[in-house]
Design a protein with these regions (language model features):
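A generic secondary-structure signal
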Residues: 36, 40, 82-86, 108, ...
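Active-site acidic Asp-centered loop
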Residues: 51, 94-96
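Short glycine/proline-enriched coil/turn segments at helix->beta-strand junctions
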Residues: 1, 26, 41-44, 62-66, ...
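Conserved beta-strand termini and adjacent loop/short-helix elements that scaffold enzyme active sites
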Residues: 49-51, 69-72, 122
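Short phosphate-binding loop-to-helix
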Residues: 56-93, 101
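Conserved core of the sugar-phosphate nucleotidyltransferase
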Residues: 101-141
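Active-site metal-binding loops of divalent metal-dependent hydrolases
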Residues: 10, 97-98
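N-terminal glycine-rich phosphate-binding loop and ensuing alpha1 helix
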Residues: 1-55
Length: 141
């Protein structure tokens, strides 16, 4: 299984001066996510999907010897489809802006993966968000 980290977005919703994935949560959040994937020991390789929208993030990933797949940065789905066309393996796709994602969560997701199904989606409940101190604004549960 290959771990894919989406790291090429513009991050415009946060209205920041710098790239969103460089925000610190113990360390830059993109590195927090990549390290969680690595520390789970679930993947044969980890690839970060970058674009011209995130040059500083790409540089940081390269400095940390993370494999890069560069895309045009058209959009999440378009960029993801580009790399999926080149991979003949199962993948776990995550956004690079999930600093609370840890190796144990990843192990549970991979453990519940069923290769007979085309895809698996992981959602969290309002109760979980509240338990980690996050105010839920868009919950349906």
């Amino acid at each position: 299984m290959i771990g894919l980290v989406m790291a090429g977005g513009k991050g415009t919703r946060m209205n920041l001066d710098d790239e969103k994935l460089l925000l610190e949560y113990k360390k830059p959040i993109i590195l927090q996510v990549v390290d969680s994937l690595k520390n789970s020991n679930c993947f044969s390789k980890i690839i970060a999907i970058t674009s011209s929208n995130s040059p500083k993030t790409k540089k940081l990933l390269q400095e940390n010897d993370i494999e890069i797949f560069d895309t045009p940065g058209i959009g999440y789905v378009e960029d993801l489809n580009l790399i999926l066309k080149t991979i003949d393996d199962d993948v776990l796709v995550t956004s690079g802006d999930l600093p609370l994602l840890d190796k144990d969560i990843i192990k549970k997701i991979v453990h519940h993966y069923n290769p007979q199904k085309i895809w698996t989606s992981v959602l969290v409940t309002s109760k979980f968000l509240t338990s980690v101190g996050i105010k839920d604004r868009k919950s349906v549960v």
